[in-house]
Amino acid sequence: MKFIIDRFDGKKNYEQIYTLAKEDIEAKTLLGVLLLIKQTQDITLNFTASCRMAICGACAVRVNGHSYLACDTKMTELFEEYKNSDTFRISPLGNHRVISDLVVDWEPAIENLRKIKPGLVAKSEFSAKEGCQQNQEEFDRIIKQWDCILCGSCVSECNKFSADQSDYMEPFVFTQAWRLANDSRSKDPMIHVKPAVANGLWNCVHCHECTNRCPKHISAAEDIANLRVMAMKKGLNTGVGPAHAKAFHTDLVEGSGRLNEIRLALRIEGVATVARTGMAITLMRAGKMNPLEIFGGHTIKGHEDLVKMIDAAKAATKE
């Protein structure tokens, strides 16, 4: 079997090919393969690993363009996923600066993590003597987010981060913000929510790749949505993002039951929408947009049932 590893020596990028017999690796994990290559073929190969138990998150890499936790990925699973392939390309995590081979720079991510104040500020009712406890129901609200091991797989898969990192944070940072804000022991959830809003909470593009590739099956996309709801309930409801969310709700409940894209632009950007006239003309020519829908489209079948479902969801959230 052929393993093409993307390498970096501090000056140039290059790829190196290693060959291993299938029978020698089929009982190993991906990390086991990397260790075998380092021990038997190339001691200069650099990668990070520690616990080998899917706890520390240090060994995440990409295989054929997708993120995997190396110690938690069996080679038999990769054989099954990439059937009829005898070649695997192993690369460092995407959306990170590469330091050496499969080793990436975590400092920018840690700086973003600091922004959301990643430590619990407990309510005054707790003390060092009595402890800082919560019941099982309260813990269950955040138990999934506690599973995050900061492996960076979500960052590597994030399409928004690939496009522009200047106005966004790593998905796991928002997961940590939600865990802290939703903790029943927290003195002030907003000390975590406000910096999340200020650093791109509304810029998620909803591709859900962070969720799809998380080795711990955490939905960072859902955590982002929950942070948005909390932010709006606390009065942080101005700007393009909240206006977009409100427009969706208005069209679903008060409108026809489907998004009116012409009105959406006007609600969000107002007169600034004029700058998108060229795009609007292109869409109309392609039959993708009907200008008459600005007056409202036809109501979808079953709209009353949709409204009932939304009302029921709201009621359940309040309980």
Swiss-Prot record:
Residues 1-96 form the 2Fe-2S ferredoxin-type domain. Gene3D superfamilies: 3.10.20.30, Alpha-helical ferredoxin (1.10.1060.10). Belongs to the succinate dehydrogenase/fumarate reductase iron-sulfur protein family. Its cofactor is [2Fe-2S] cluster; [4Fe-4S] cluster. Binds 1 2Fe-2S cluster. The MFR complex is composed of three subunits: a flavoprotein (SdhA), an iron-sulfur protein (SdhB), and one hydrophobic anchor protein (SdhE). This is 8-methylmenaquinol:fumarate reductase iron-sulfur subunit. It comes from the Bacteria. One of its GO terms (biological process) is tricarboxylic acid cycle. It comes from Wolinella succinogenes (strain ATCC 29543 / DSM 1740 / CCUG 13145 / JCM 31913 / LMG 7466 / NCTC 11488 / FDC 602W). The lineage of its organism: Bacteria, Pseudomonadati, Campylobacterota, Epsilonproteobacteria, Campylobacterales. Pfam families: Fer2_3, Fer4_8. It catalyses: 8-methylmenaquinone-6 + succinate = 8-methylmenaquinol-6 + fumarate. InterPro entries: 2Fe-2S_ferredoxin-like_sf, 2Fe2S_fd_BS, 4Fe4S_Fe-S-bd, Beta-grasp_dom_sf, Helical_ferredxn, SDH/FR_iron-sulfur_subunit, SDH/FRD_Iron-Sulfur, Succ_DH/fum_Rdtase_Fe-S. [2Fe-2S] cluster binds at C51, C56, C59, C71. One of its GO terms (molecular function) is 4 iron, 4 sulfur cluster binding. Residues 139-168, 193-224 form the 4Fe-4S ferredoxin-type domain. It is found in: Periplasm; Cell membrane. Iron-sulfur subunit of 8-methylmenaquinol:fumarate reductase (MFR), that catalyzes the reduction of fumarate using 8-methylmenaquinol-6 as electron donor. The complex shows no succinate oxidation activity. Is involved in anaerobic metabolism. [4Fe-4S] cluster binds at C148, C151, C154, C158, C204, C207, C210, C214. One of its GO terms (cellular component) is periplasmic space. SUPFAM superfamilies: 2Fe-2S ferredoxin-like (SSF54292), alpha-helical ferredoxin (SSF46548). It is a peripheral membrane protein. It is an enzyme of class 1 (oxidoreductase). Keywords: 2Fe-2S, 4Fe-4S, Cell membrane, Electron transport, Iron, Iron-sulfur, Membrane, Metal-binding, Oxidoreductase, Periplasm, Transport. Its EC number is 1.3.5.-.
